[in-house]
Amino acid sequence: MTSSSSFSRFDGRAQDQMRAVKITRGFTSNPAGSVLVEFGNTRVMCTASVELGVPRFKRDSGEGWLTAEYAMLPAATAERNRRESMAGKVKGRTHEISRLIGRSLRAAVDLSQLGENTIAIDCDVLQADGGTRTASITGAYVALADAIKVLQERGVVPGSPLLAPVAAVSVGLVDGNVCLDLPYEEDSRADVDLNVVMTEHGEFVEIQGTGEETTFTRAQLNDMLDYAEKGCRELVAAQKAALGI
């Protein structure tokens, strides 16, 4: 692993150490699934709502659908950001993250076993300190599991659509050193930034990687993926503990 003896992380963690992770189920009472997920100081409310019917392109297919939306509250960051709905235009970054969350969660559900029902995932960032998209995916899986349980209890879902857990984590190169689960202080100055989505079985759902300030080698990429795999294993354990499985 790439490391310098003089390097120390902003918050004192080891390079391969996650921030404190907390998953609270039943955070609100209206949705079928509702979770508050915390990665250190990053806090995201993830909900899963059930809608009868599917989009037009799925009608009469016998399959369900899962969609996702992501947003940040105005005061989620140190400097207030105007609501995108008030500005009249959703930013490209917001669309990108929404689609990422949707793709990631669809890897965790067998749509053919969902019937013609839609699960809408909403991830609202209450406080942002790096890793909001990865926290959203990790928390949303738990909300999804609760929503599917509600559907099964109501007799709406004919099968068992929930698949293996999916979790996500950030990893990057900070001053040339591989670091896991970057807070904003590290993320904002990272040489390389990676977001990795994985299943419980160690399979990749998505890898997003960018050389923000420099290029990176295959060896460094392998190191970052090793760190990400370790982080995702720990996150899956946290998901299963929250669900009592």
From Swiss-Prot:
GO terms for molecular function: 3'-5'-RNA exonuclease activity; tRNA binding; tRNA nucleotidyltransferase activity. Keywords: Nucleotidyltransferase, RNA-binding, rRNA processing, Transferase, tRNA processing, tRNA-binding. It catalyses: tRNA(n+1) + phosphate = tRNA(n) + a ribonucleoside 5'-diphosphate. PROSITE patterns: RIBONUCLEASE_PH. Its EC number is 2.7.7.56. GO terms for biological process: rRNA catabolic process; rRNA processing; tRNA processing. InterPro entries: ExoRNase_PH_dom1 (IPR001247), ExoRNase_PH_dom2 (IPR015847), ExoRNase_PH_dom2_sf (IPR036345), PNPase/RNase_PH_dom_sf (IPR027408), Ribosomal_Su5_D2-typ_SF (IPR020568), RNase_PH (IPR050080), RNase_PH_bac-type (IPR002381), RNase_PH_CS (IPR018336). HAMAP family: RNase_PH. Phosphorolytic 3'-5' exoribonuclease that plays an important role in tRNA 3'-end maturation. Removes nucleotide residues following the 3'-CCA terminus of tRNAs; can also add nucleotides to the ends of RNA molecules by using nucleoside diphosphates as substrates, but this may not be physiologically important. Probably plays a role in initiation of 16S rRNA degradation (leading to ribosome degradation) during starvation. Belongs to the RNase PH family. This is Ribonuclease PH. It comes from Corynebacterium glutamicum (strain R). The gene is rph.
